[in-house]
Amino acid sequence: MMLIRVLANLLILQLSYAQKSSELVIGGDECNINEHRFLVALYDFWSGDFLCGGTLINQEYVLTAAHCKTRNMYIYLGMHNKSVQFDDEQRRYPKKKYFFRCRNNFTRWDKDIMLIRLNRPVRNSAHIAPLSLPSSPPTVGSVCRVMGWGTITSPNETLPDVPRCANINLFNYTVCHGVFPWLPARSRILCAGVLQGGIDTCKRDSGGPLICNGQFQGIVSWGPKPCAQPRKPALYTKVFDHLDWIQSIIAGNTTVTCPP
């Protein structure tokens, strides 16, 4: 009887810690200065407000979330600290934005993806290098890396100068469907997070990468509010299922056939 009571008290302490963590920590620790050379920052042209993250996939293209779209934007590459500029930082503008319009076997939740062609190529440097597209699909159970300049508190926003990085877990889609039952029964979207809470992507992390086993597998799409709640993972657009579309556009075919 005493053992049961002790275990119950430990469980209560564990849950209360997870709930406090979800209020205090979002997005993990500051990223290492050398681990995010592909991470870009999208800004509103007129207000100068930071909007979203994105991923450089070659010298001319950036991949981000479709809901990050705005009529006029500019893109910073090679940035680490918003308040301290590197000599090799580069600024580009969208030449063309591409959106995934296919409907076959894709729900509206699966299509939060935008491919941006830059107005001129980017030069690789000490703080700038592209991240390759995935060569294989992600595996449930993988530990994945997320990063971004998104808010580190929720629901109120506190935006950091330096991007935060964190490790989260990739779950079966059924986990997210159980949390958000209004989602379609089947979806291509990825479900990832930390079930204990306390670590999560949040507002303005949108568009940034989900990197699993060294491969660019997801794009930050959306999640619960407030962020980092226990047992409430977030959702990520699955890059692998859009490979044909991405590669066809890069090759110059803008009237691509929808993938199966």
Swiss-Prot record:
GO terms for molecular function: serine-type endopeptidase activity; toxin activity. It comes from the Eukaryota. Residues 1-18 form the signal peptide. Glycans are attached at residues 81, 105, 156, 172, 253. It is an enzyme of class 3 (hydrolase). Its EC number is 3.4.21.-. The active site is at 67 (charge relay system), 112 (charge relay system), 206 (charge relay system). The keyword Secreted applies. Glycosylated. One of its GO terms (cellular component) is extracellular region. Expressed by the venom gland. Its activity is inhibited by diisopropylfluorophosphate (DFP) and PMSF, whereas EDTA has no effect on it. It is found in: Secreted. Keywords: Blood coagulation cascade activating toxin, Disulfide bond, Glycoprotein, Hemostasis impairing toxin, Hydrolase, Protease, Secreted, Serine protease, Signal, Toxin, Zymogen. Residues 25-251 form the Peptidase S1 domain. Disulfide bonds join 31-165, 52-68, 102-258, 144-212, 176-191, 202-227. Residues 19-24 form a propeptide. InterPro entries: Peptidase_S1_PA, Peptidase_S1_PA_chymotrypsin, Peptidase_S1A, Trypsin_dom, TRYPSIN_HIS. Monomer. Thrombin-like snake venom serine protease that has fibrinogen-clotting activity (FGA or FGB). Negative results: does not act on factor X, prothrombin and plasminogen. This is Thrombin-like enzyme stejnobin. It comes from Trimeresurus stejnegeri (Chinese green tree viper).
